[in-house]
């Protein structure tokens, strides 16, 4: 009888762990092949810009504390080079009483080549907060962009096309979910 009960508890714990993990972003997305600078730019733009206007409020929930309201301090999509060439670019800065989060995504092209990059910073506004700063690897999936820290292997930020940021993780392992 004790053996059956033990196996029941073991199976139940496996189910609970599986359910909890299914709510986190996919850790091994299938990359989407982007073939041109325009594809990259459109992908970035749809992730960052649609629901982020300067002055608006966005709310995140960190797993160990109450909701945190951020104000969109800066949001822009595109700039041109000095030669007037269009360069894909998307950037977002959101601030609260406790945090400042900056995300930049950029895609540049020329001479038949394309290049993309990203930068993210999650900085506390007081000394006892966890800070995070890196230039992550960009992974494109069907409807999301994953920013992966190559040093730690963690997905520091996930952006959903047409929505914006849906998930972040700082270097202390705290997860931030958009509400």
Placement of each model-derived feature along the sequence:
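C-terminal motif of bacterial Sec signal peptides marking the signal peptidase cleavage site
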Residues: 15-18
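Sec-dependent signal peptide recognition
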Residues: 2-9
